[in-house]
């Protein structure tokens, strides 16, 4: 009987030690939720974390981006040729335009010969004019010019995606993708979930144990509408989504980080497209700094008084920028956790 008691005691001690170790491990783990509307740059931030804080992507993973970049090329040129009168392209391109207008961009292999044909279409004067004047109305992917300018390289038989290709390529996030990495003995779990409206109902499944929410908004989206609902302005959608999240009682003890993203696009766009046309109460004209301040204040105005929040102006495709910003974010998150929980 004494032996049984001794055995049970050892087993109990082992269980207690396991539970203690698990608790200590959880204390050194920070779960971050990456939220925002579709095309806000969330997934690019997640990919940057892979490059900055891990060994990046394996050769097998890099290979999967070939097909994604190919589909980016084909879907981009397809949107353009579907929206330009065929007669403006000239008789030598008419048949090619009709063909690429009808294909499935996710199924057609991008061969070198097809790449040359797409390059000719892209450089056509009518296509270039349409791109420069109507890209917002057409909801063109931001990767359009990047991939079409380099279609010869991307369609090469020996093409291997570069780090910039991986960061810039457009792939819609569905469901959940988790990126894990360690910084100074702290394990971070970054949860990226789809931002389109039909994906948002799934978000609540990932709310448990979230220490901080990183919310991405695309600054340059103020003149664009949602792909999934062309009656809704993208910036207005982001503001509503932010309001719903930041005022959710579930997150009363959660810190928030606001990424005012795609700063590079906004810097150029505000010089040409008046912000006041979409937000009548804006009074800063074409001034970049005043535009940033206005949008930041729009988001901050709905934040509860007790909520811990910091904002950063970011360009998700700029690795140096994201490295510096995330280092500051990491420190702020840890300080917020200590303040809220200890």
UniProtKB/Swiss-Prot annotation:
Gene3D superfamilies, sorted: GI Alpha 1, domain 2-like, P-loop containing nucleotide triphosphate hydrolases
GO (cellular component) term, any one: plasma membrane
G4 motif: region residues: 257-264
GO biological process: adenylate cyclase-inhibiting G protein-coupled receptor signaling pathway; adenylate cyclase-modulating G protein-coupled receptor signaling pathway; negative regulation of adenylate cyclase-activating G protein-coupled receptor signaling pathway; negative regulation of asexual reproduction; negative regulation of cell growth; negative regulation of cGMP-mediated signaling; negative regulation of developmental process; negative regulation of G protein-coupled receptor signaling pathway
Positions of region (G2 motif): 165-173
Binding site for GTP: 36-43, 167-173, 192-196, 261-264, 316
UniProt-annotated stretches for the region G1 motif: 31-44
Subunit structure, as described in the record: G proteins are composed of 3 units; alpha, beta and gamma. The alpha chain contains the guanine nucleotide binding site.
Protein name: Guanine nucleotide-binding protein alpha-9 subunit
The organism of origin for this protein: Dictyostelium discoideum
Gene it is expressed from: gpaI
